[in-house]
Amino acid sequence: MDINIDKYKNITRNLERDIVNLNPIQRGGILPTEAKKVIYEYWDGYSVCDYCSGRLDKIETPPINEFLDDMSKFLGMDITRPTHGARESKYAVMNAICKKGDYVVLDGNSHYTSYVALERANLNYVKTDVEEYPNFRVIPKSYAEKIDELEDSGKNIGLILLTHVDGSYGNVSDVSKVGKIAKSKGYPLLLNCAYSVGRMPVDGKKLNVDFIAASGHKSMAASGPCGLLSINAEYEDEILKTSKVNVVKELQMLGCTSRGIPILSLMASFPHIIERVKNWNLELEKTRKVVFEFEKLGFIALGEKPRNHDIIRFETPVLDKIAEKDKRRGFFFYEELKKRGIGGIRRGVTKEFKMSVYGLTGMQVDYIIDCIKSIVLENAN
């Protein structure tokens, strides 16, 4: 075989050790020390299955069964299953409760995986309206309008889907309003919580939802791929239907889902998650401070104000103007950040960028503010 295997030896990553990472897709997935320790015990393939009697969610050692029960309590739901991610959770719901050709009514800020999931399940969709620039907030009443339009045209609706917090602008949707609309119309509501569960408090019962799709690696301090599907008991028979061939295995889970390091890291991080969501107001204070300071530089924060989530998206005409004159062009900002030990911002981007300071200390946040201020002021003239 003509294969150079040297590139697979000694693979390393120093981003988290050497650089303050501002990437919003990664800030919520950083493991605490206690979760890192468990990796050494469960890094072998099927190590989680030492005492398995046939189904992942029933394993007692390690206590996966108890963890899933506790997670249901944490989320204000009835039943929870591990998945490989929020996208798999969404697909499981769609594939179980919808019929081929049904319509999913979903918000205009939905993640691409929501579309991929419904397409894979052979479903159609109608997208609801969002506010115009610069807020881009989901408009709850648009759900009622789209539902009415579909019903009037004789289309079958299988599911209502709402993105709790979108990854583009970090807007927090008004779940209660959409939940009331879904209930009044008689349709189940799936809440995509990939950017919320694990970062901020989420209670499914209070929010009036039927399903929660969560991401372990995106927002719950877990290794990937890992997610959760939490459901209300009334949908247990549909979602958790078992195989005719192997009556123990649940169809939508394809028998067993996330096992090994992903599920164990999620379990080990659970105490950390419970505590950190209690400090959500402190996270918002840091986020709003960043927005306040950077808008003084000429940055334009997109999305709702005041910010209600740690994801921040800035339009940065001042950086784009600097890039026009700098010989490094669009790469100048990335390189200047790197010099100062800051990463997570896409290379070559100066028109706009996204960032998050979730989980960083106050001193780290101040350092980031001071660094970006200095980059702008030193290069603006």
Swiss-Prot record:
**Cofactor names:** pyridoxal 5'-phosphate
Q: Which family does it belong to?
A: Belongs to the SepCysS family.
Q: Which UniProt keywords apply?
A: Protein biosynthesis, Pyridoxal phosphate, Transferase
Instruction: Give the top-level enzyme category.
Output: transferase
Positions modified as N6-(pyridoxal phosphate)lysine? K218
Q: Which reaction does it catalyse?
A: O-phospho-L-seryl-tRNA(Cys) + hydrogen sulfide + H(+) = L-cysteinyl-tRNA(Cys) + phosphate
Q: Which Pfam families match?
A: SepSecS (PF05889)
The GO terms this record gives for MF are: Sep-tRNA:Cys-tRNA synthase activity
| InterPro entries in the cross-refs | PyrdxlP-dep_Trfase, PyrdxlP-dep_Trfase_major, PyrdxlP-dep_Trfase_small, Sep_Cys-tRNA_synth_arc, SepSecS/SepCysS
Tell me the superkingdom of the source.
Answer: Archaea
Subunit structure as annotated in this protein's UniProt entry: Homodimer. Interacts with SepRS.
GO BP annotations, alphabetical order: translation
Record-linked Gene3D superfamilies: Aspartate Aminotransferase, domain 1, Type I PLP-dependent aspartate aminotransferase-like (Major domain)
Quote the function comment for this protein: Converts O-phospho-L-seryl-tRNA(Cys) (Sep-tRNA(Cys)) to L-cysteinyl-tRNA(Cys) (Cys-tRNA(Cys)).
EC id: 2.5.1.73
Q: What is the lineage of its organism?
A: Archaea, Methanobacteriati, Methanobacteriota, Methanomada group, Methanococci
Q: What is this protein called?
A: O-phospho-L-seryl-tRNA:Cys-tRNA synthase
Residues engaged in binding pyridoxal 5'-phosphate: A86, R87, N192, S215, G216, H217
